[in-house]
A protein has these predicted regions:
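Cys/His-rich Zn2+-coordinating "finger/knuckle" modules used by eukaryotic regulatory proteins
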Residues: 1-2
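Hydrophobic transmembrane signal anchors and adjacent membrane-proximal interface regions, especially
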Residues: 33-35, 76-78, 337
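Eukaryotic intrinsically disordered, low-complexity regions enriched in serine, threonine, and proline
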Residues: 58-61, 65, 69-105, 268, ...
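Active-site region of the double-stranded beta-helix
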Residues: 92-137, 145-403, 410-414
C-alpha cells in the first residue's frame, strides 16, 4: 500500500517509478548500451538540472527512507558522521584492491583513474569491477574479441552481407551528412584510393552513423547480435539492464546495440595536429560499453607505415603502460579516446564557450557545446583546459578487442 495509507510500509520501487513517470526525461539517445546506473556525478542539464540517474538515485533513497517506521528513529553511527580530512580515494582503492584481489590480473592507468582488467576470462573480474564502478570510474577490459566470432565483424564480411543497403554517412571534416550506398563506405574502409573526394579534392573522412541500431540491429544482424558479450547487461532484455525493468508505458530510448564504423585519420600524412575526430566531445546519458571488434589496415598512396602510426600515437600524453602496449607486436591499436569525468562538465562547457568567443563565433544563451557535440578538443585546447581550468584529459588507446566501459555522465571524444 502507499506510504500515506500505512506509514509502517514504504512504497515499492515500482510504485515510485510509476508515480514519477511524468518527471523522468531520458534525454538524448545518442549513447551506447545501458548498464544499471550505480552513481551519478553527471553535470546538470537543461533548466531543471536533473538527469535520469539523479532521479533514480532519489527514488531508491526514498524507498529506503520510507521503510523506516516513524516511531523508531534511525541509529546514527557517530564515527561515520565525523569525517576526517579527505584522503586520496585512488590510493585507498588501489591499496585495498591489491590485497583483496591478488588473483585478478589488473592495472591502473591514466593517473590511476581507469581500471584495466587484463584477463577477460577471469571469473572474479566482476568483484573488482564492482568496487571500481561504485567510484564512477571507467574500466578497460582486454581481449573481448577472443570470445566472439571474428569473421562476422570483418569489414569485408559486413560489406558482402549488407552492401546493397542505404545509410546516413557523415563526413567528419565538414559535418555534411549524405544518404548513400553502404558498399561505397566499406570499399574505402581500408583502401584510401577508393575513398570519396570532396569539392576541393581532399579525401573525405567518413563515418557510418549508428547503422544499424537498436531493434534494427537485432533484426538485420541476428548472428552478430547474439555474438555480443555481456548479454545480461547489454541486451535490451538483460536482467542487469535497468532499462528492461521500466514500466511498459515508458517511451523506451534507443540504447543500442549499434555499430559505429569510421575511417581512421591517424594513418594519413596530411593530419598533423589531429584537429578532427570521428566522434566529437559529448556526454553519455547512460552507462556504455564500447568494444573494438575490428581494426582495418589502410593502404594506398599517402598512408603511413605501421611504425609511422605508432610514432604519431606516442606523441600523445600516454600512460607508461599504454606506451608499452604500443610496442607489443601482438597488439593492434585502433582508436584514440579522450575521457573526462562528469564532475568536470561545467568547467569544460565554460572553457569551450570561452574559446568560441575568442574565435569570433556566436554564443547563444541556449547553446550547449557539449550537448550539441560541436567540438573536438585538439591537443592545444586540451593543454589550455588543464592550465586554465585544472581539468586533465584521460587519454586511452583502444586496441583490438578492448571494451571501454564508461559510466553515465562521463564525457569523451574519439
Amino acid at each position: 500500500p502507499p506510504a500515506s495509507q500505512n506509514n509502517e510500509q514504504g512504497s515499492t520501487l515500482r510504485d515510485l517509478l510509476t508515480t514519477t513517470a511524468g518527471k523522468l526525461r531520458l534525454g538524448s539517445t545518442d549513447a551506447g548500451i545501458a548498464f544499471a546506473p550505480v552513481y551519478s556525478t553527471g553535470a546538470a542539464s537543461g533548466k531543471s538540472g536533473r538527469t535520469m540517474p539523479n532521479i533514480l538515485d532519489d527514488i531508491i533513497a526514498s524507498v529506503v527512507e520510507n521503510k523506516i517506521p516513524p516511531n523508531r528513529a534511525p541509529k546514527i553511527n557517530v564515527k561515520s558522521e565525523i569525517k576526517d580530512e579527505p584522503k586520496d580515494d585512488k590510493k585507498c582503492i588501489q591499496d585495498d584492491c591489491s590485497k583483496r584481489y591478488s588473483d585478478i590480473q589488473y592495472s591502473w592507468i591514466c593517473d590511476k583513474h581507469v581500471l584495466w582488467l587484463r584477463d577477460h576470462k577471469n571469473s572474479n573480474n566482476w568483484k573488482l569491477f564492482k568496487e571500481c564502478w561504485k567510484q564512477g570510474r571507467p574500466v578497460l577490459v582486454s581481449g573481448m574479441h577472443k570470445k566472439m566470432n571474428f569473421s562476422l565483424w570483418k569489414a569485408e564480411s559486413i560489406s558482402m552481407d549488407f552492401g546493397n543497403q542505404q545509410a546516413d554517412i557523415l563526413n567528419c571534416k565538414d559535418s555534411i551528412i549524405s544518404n548513400t550506398n553502404v558498399k561505397e563506405f566499406w570499399d574505402g574502409f581500408e583502401d584510401v584510393s577508393k575513398r570519396q573526394k570532396v569539392k576541393n579534392g581532399e579525401t573525405a573522412l567518413l563515418k557510418l552513423k549508428d547503422w544499424p541500431s537498436g531493434e534494427d540491429f537485432k533484426a538485420m544482424m541476428p548472428a552478430r547480435y547474439f555474438d555480443l558479450p555481456l548479454p545480461e547487461y547489454c541486451s535490451p532484455e538483460g536482467k542487469l539492464n535497468l532499462a528492461s525493468h521500466l514500466p511498459g508505458f515508458f517511451v523506451r530510448p534507443d540504447l543500442g546495440p549499434r555499430l559505429c564504423s569510421a575511417y581512421g585519420e591517424f594513418a594519413l600524412f596530411l593530419y598533423t595536429y589531429h584537429d578532427i575526430g570521428t566522434t566529437n566531445l559529448h556526454i553519455e546519458v547512460s552507462d556504455v560499453v564500447n568494444i573494438l571488434v575490428y581494426v582495418g589496415i589502410a593502404k594506398g598512396n599517402g598512408v603511413l607505415s605501421k611504425s609511422g602510426v605508432l610514432k604519431k600515437l606516442e606523441e600523445e600524453d600516454l600512460d607508461d603502460l599504454l606506451r608499452k602496449r604500443l610496442k607489443d607486436s601482438s597488439e593492434l591499436p585502433g582508436a584514440l579516446w579522450h575521457i573526462y569525468a562528469g564532475k568536470d562538465a561545467d568547467k569544460i562547457r565554460e572553457f569551450l564557450q570561452k574559446i568560441a568567443k575568442e574565435q569570433g563565433l556566436e554564443v547563444l544563451p541556449e547553446h550547449d557545446p557539449i550537448r550539441d557535440q560541436s567540438w573536438y578538443v585538439n591537443r592545444k585546447l586540451r593543454q589550455r583546459l588543464f592550465e586554465e581550468y585544472g581539468v586533465k584529459t584521460c587519454t586511452v588507446i583502444q586496441f583490438l578487442g578492448d571494451a571501454i566501459i564508461l559510466p553515465a555522465g562521463a564525457l569523451h571524444q574519439v
